Amino acid sequence: MDGDIRKNSLDDGSMDALTGEQSIRNFNINFGPQHPAAHGLLRMVLELDGEIVERADPHIGLLHRGTEKLMESRTYLQNLPYLDRLDYVAPMNQEHAWCLAIERLTGTVIPRRASLIRVLYSEIGRILNHLMGVTTGAMDVGALTPPLWGFEAREELMIFYERACGARLHAAYFRPGGVHQDLPPDLLDDIEEWCERFPKLVDDLDTLLTENRIFKQRLVDIGIVTEADALDWGYTGVMVRGSGLAWDLRRSQPYECYDEFDFQIPVGRNGDCYDRYLCRMAEMRESCKIMQQAVQKLRAEPAGDVLARGKLTPPRRAEMKRDMESLIHHFKLYTEGFKVPAGEVYAAVEGPKGEFGVYLVADGTNKPWRAKLRAPGFAHLQSIDWMSRGHMLADVPAIIATLDIVFGEVDR
């Protein structure tokens, strides 16, 4: 009929009015939270132009438990297990920062033996983390053998955790004033024997991955971060060292007795995913050397207390059985908790993923007034849009893997 305005039934609003052709639009997809390469509860809305990433919008908070608020209503000692549940891949490294913050506010000096045990188990945590990061990252780009090898070594390290404190994962082993208990007699021998075998595993992973043509094609020149960019985004750990900046708190701001240990700081040149992979491989070798040195120093150290006895720590069991004052102190410590002098402090450790810090504000009571947790993964994840823009969709899992994020600490 004359005058009819005939509409194309297939037109969904994307038809060009002048030419009648279908205009090409970007489309959005959801990456995660149920995705094997998301490394936790990561949901990203990806805007794609074909297979090119135009925008990556990370949605966080799916694992938010309100940790910082919960810490304000519990005693300092009751708060310690919360730290294990942040970066649950290497739990003791987070406990370390919490204990350092309390010790600095109270002016506590811990026994040397406890300090050496802390260094030993912090490096075990670093290897636990890097084995997980490197091998699952390799799996994300198609190499299925490394996780099978890496998790075998991780299992042995988790048994060392269990033999020291009774727990494989949520240890609560580091305590304000030292560590909960001394190591069993044969444990140092077994750790030393493991350290002699471990470089062979790293060599095998090296042979399998480092010069593998497909592996290099997936990582080289992907997710490049310059030194200036790393500083602008607030990167720490491997993310900043992979870009050429030799910043490591164990060397630049030594804590515990790290200044007594001989180790190198692996540094990359190109700031891409491949350099970050190489840094983690080299760091595992250096951590193994630190563990061997710690074992030798612990052997040379006379057997003694691993807790600085005082207001922060319980009395010895033998004293409690014969002294009423000690028994009362023990009861008060585990019911009311110890008081921390009013003040504020920032204590940071070089965690496996970067600088993990605790900003603690004390008001003189037995509970913190405020505890701010500085999670390295949070700073790294904020740049995922900037890092992945212009890359292929298949490059996104490789970038996420070398960011090394875990959602226990990102969401807190």
Swiss-Prot record:
This is NADH-quinone oxidoreductase subunit 4. The gene is nqo4. GO terms for molecular function: NAD binding; NADH:ubiquinone reductase (non-electrogenic) activity; quinone binding. The keyword Translocase applies. SUPFAM superfamilies: HydB/Nqo4-like (SSF56762). Signal peptide: none annotated. Its EC number is 7.1.1.-. NCBIfam families: NuoD (TIGR01962), PRK06075.1 (NF004739). The lineage of its organism: Bacteria, Pseudomonadati, Pseudomonadota, Alphaproteobacteria, Rhodobacterales. InterPro entries: NADH_Q_OxRdtase_suD (IPR001135), NADH_UbQ_OxRdtase_49kDa_CS (IPR014029), NDH1_su_D/H (IPR022885), NiFe-Hase_large (IPR029014). Belongs to the complex I 49 kDa subunit family. One of its GO terms (cellular component) is plasma membrane. It is an enzyme of class 7 (translocase).
